[in-house]
Amino acid sequence: MKTTAVIDALGALAHEYRLAIYRLLVEQGPEGLAAGAIGARMGLVPSSLTFHLQALQRAGLVTQVRASRQLIYSADYAVMNELVGYLTDNCCGASGGACDAACGPATRSPKRGRAA
């Protein structure tokens, strides 16, 4: 992933609503979510939602498809994985492996309301 694409992606995610929308879409899975449903969950009016979704699209983090009269948005998992890979690619590279455990995958935090 090119540095400019990483900067664009991180810049797009550097806003409370865009980060929340992106996390919602990642959680939703590849089938995505209709714009109206995203707006309802986020409590955003259509114009604000469009603004934020367009920023995520420009950064390549979100894709849009038309299904009949609805616009369906979904996270682009390939781009997400490239971004994470870029950020962790050289993790502890200069330490001679002394901090390899720190560079491992993050443990998931337990979901609220679900049994552990």
Q: Where are the model-predicted features located?
A:
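A generic local structural motif
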Residues: 8, 58-59
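Alpha-helical residues within the helix-turn-helix
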Residues: 40, 57-58
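Short coil turns linking two alpha-helices in DNA-binding domains
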Residues: 45-46, 50-52
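N-terminal helix-turn-helix DNA-binding core of bacterial DNA-binding proteins
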Residues: 4-5, 11-45, 67-79
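Secondary-structure transition/capping residues
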Residues: 17, 32-33, 49, 94, ...
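Amphipathic alpha-helical dimerization/coiled-coil segments
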Residues: 1-5, 23-27, 77-116
